Amino acid sequence: VLLRRKILALGLAAAALGQANEPAKPLVATTPRVPAVGIELPGDARAQLRERTDALGQAIDALARQHVDTPPLLHHLPDVQVYHKAVDWALKHRIFFKPSELKTAGELLVEGRERAAQLAKGKTPWTRATGLVVRGYVSRLDDSVQPYGLVIPPSVSTDPWRKRRLDIWLHGRDDKLSELKFIQQRHTSAGQFTPPDTIVLHPYGRFCNAFKFAGEMDVLEALAHAKTQYPVDGNRVSIRGFSMGGAGCWHLGTHFAGDWVAVAPGAGFAESLEYLGLTRKNAMPPAYEQTLWGLYDATKYAGNLFNTATVAYSGEIDKQRQAANIMERHLTAEGLALHHVIGPDTGHKYHPAAKAEIDDRVNAVAAKGRNPVPAEVRLVTQTLRYNRQGWVQVDGLETHWKPARVKARLTSEKRVEVATDNVSRLVLSMPSGLCPLRPNGNPTVVIDGDELTGARIRTDRSWEALFVNALGRWRAVGRFKFAGLAKRPGLQGPIDDAFINRFLMVRPTGPALSPMADKWTAAQLGQALSDWELQFRAKPLVKDDNDITDADIADCNLILWGDPQSNSTIARVIDQLPLGWSETTVQLGQAVAESATHAPMLIYPNPLNPKRYIVLNSGFTFSRFGHMSNATQTPKLPDWALVDMRRPYNAGDPTCIAAAGFFNERWQLPMPE
């Protein structure tokens, strides 16, 4: 357990922890709004734009009613809604940043009205258009409509069924990149690279987060949606980007390496510690936050690039060359030699000759395609959130946030050899038609020297074999059995993990245990709702505690605000949480504090549905860092924390965190050392 002993030591009486004479300040730490407030629009122009925007909204409502019984047409409604949202939210959030964006807003409303009129007639011509196309989808996270852009090659119009290569392009940092500006760019610019006969996908990434957290999910959801709409060859999907997009490319490239035919980052950053110069600045965060760099640091996942082709780019005199340099060091340690293209005497941009070389190399790799079942797969991870490469999947770790490794090789048509470290549950899985193992008999699987009989190959030429490591010995099993709770993929924490799947904010309706808790909860909930709307471009799903249904419990991570007295859902589960919470004290393991002045935050499997999370009293944790470098946008809290309500809350400020730590692999508080 990692404790910040601001208030207590083991055995210290809780009454000694709180200082009753200290003034209550249940406030959120003040930081610049992200995105910033834009220019003031002329009153008449704003009123006219609002009227036209509302008219499009009414047309969309009418379309929803009209096509309620025709799902194929209703599925195209987001293609209209993205235009309405772009202008509506620019007005609502006051994020017009220059006068010319008034004209842009008008143009987007015209396009939205045109699509609405076409959809009313049962027509969707934009779905067959070539060139620059804007599409929309509904996110599973929060039911929000999110835009993405496409470059559709002319060949699609004459040969629409042939599967094609798709390149994902991740945009650079722009803390003024509203939906309005993004869609305008996607109407007017094809981007840096447009290879022939290739679909190019431009994700919005939910604003400016380096394609992490919900931004990561936006890339994956946009890709999944595009695959349902266009002839995409799943073995020829590459990921590319520059600057912040280069950082996103390093992240998504290493964490999902086996999914890409090529990874081509330019500039950006690949980790937080060296890029931010924290050691040099003597600005190291708490130990638990440093541990959580193991979630997104691409350097810690460099070994996964064994599973794909990588072409990196840097300008010779670009400070962000640091990203490729540090990745090169880590790849060398993995036995891999990074191909690093340098733009001579070039700063933060592509050099023309280097750009041409990158294109040639990526084109050559993409032409060959990705091997979906390679003879050898390597996996490196520190968390079950990122647990798969190719046909290798890790379903259990011995210890989270320490390196776990798998090296798996097909050594013959009836033998697989695997070496692991820090792995407790392993799955080897190959899809239909692709298993190269001999179809009759059982393959031999050797794991860390233990020779085992694997499951038989199925007649559709698929294969799945499960293995468990118990007390240092591996054995084959038919299915994983869990006696009680265990960390598993998608249920492993930290707190931020709850916000990359569908979640529901649950408001308290009763009085809290203390007046301070009432005020603090209201402030934190309000800030969390605002932060998600502004920084992740969606209104969170919200319900009162007494309105929660069985369907909500089945489908959503529940973000519970308040305490057992104010929130009836917390009261339902409190006895099954590793938490003591009374009128006088709140306790997590060794950490004890007065409930009048302290609140718990935690993530835990929902006792009402252990396939989903509950979270207590927290939104995403980096919100106070949204205006800073994207490299600071990392998780600020682990699995649990006790927070001092008397201080302005900022998850990244250790002075307001009384104690914090991780649950073990059984979702238990570790024993004292």
Language-model regions, residue ranges each:
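Amphipathic, heptad-repeat alpha-helical segments
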Residues: 22-80
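Active-site machinery of serine-nucleophile hydrolases
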Residues: 161-230, 599
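C-terminal catalytic histidine-bearing segment of alpha/beta-hydrolase fold enzymes
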Residues: 313, 317-423
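Solvent-exposed alpha-helical segments and adjacent loops
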Residues: 429-673
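A domain-start/cap signature at the N-terminus of enzymes
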Residues: 21-39, 93-164
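Short beta-strand immediately N-terminal to the catalytic nucleophile in serine-hydrolase-like folds
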Residues: 239-241, 264-266, 313
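Mobile cap/lid helix-loop segments that gate and shape the active-site cleft of serine hydrolases
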Residues: 174-185, 258-303, 307-308
